[in-house]
Amino acid sequence: MSGASGSGKTTLLRQLKPAIAPYGKRQGAVLYEGRPVEELEKRRAALEIGFVFQSPDAQIVTDRVSSELAFGLENAGVPPEEIRRRVAEMAGFFGIEGWYHKAIEALSGGQRQMLNLASVMVMNPKVLILDEPTSQLDPVSAGNFIGMLEKLNRELGQTILLTEHRQEELFPLADRIGMMELGRLK
């Protein structure tokens, strides 16, 4: 999704994740699998709708990589043996096994954002939503992050909805492009 600053991209994306949807009166409906998204059971919404914020530090809640990767699954009540399996699989997919025992503070901004993505993907979401995830990254880290999004889509068939200013890198990868203008998707 593309659009000028202030066009409503972030507001729309946040409507798709009930736990972070803005307060206030909404016009129209946001449907997920044919039902209003706000009617989704909280656990289901947490597992099936992943969200990565713009800032690498906006969603990290623990002090160690291993804890961060497991946090969402633990909160969802996933059994410990499944948590270990899913965390190991996703760390391998992302190539971040070497970070596993590191403190979060030892990671760069690009590594933190990649960890955010891995922490969301370990939940195995049906839909991955990202709000300008590379805007605070250096060009190399941004390229690595975009490459991982392409890999997630190509190898795992992951549905991805994102806003991003690096349009020239992402437009060739998109199946559809929506334009936001004055709060409306065109």
Predicted regions and their residues:
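Conserved ABC ATPase signature
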Residues: 103-107
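Conserved catalytic motifs of ABC-family nucleotide-binding domains
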Residues: 124
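Conserved ABC ATPase "signature" region
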Residues: 81-99
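ABC ATPase NBD coupling module
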Residues: 36-50
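Conserved ABC transporter NBD signature motif
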Residues: 25-35, 45
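Catalytic Walker B motif of ABC-type/P-loop ATPase nucleotide-binding domains
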Residues: 128-131
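H-loop/switch region of ABC-family ATPase nucleotide-binding domains
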Residues: 164-165
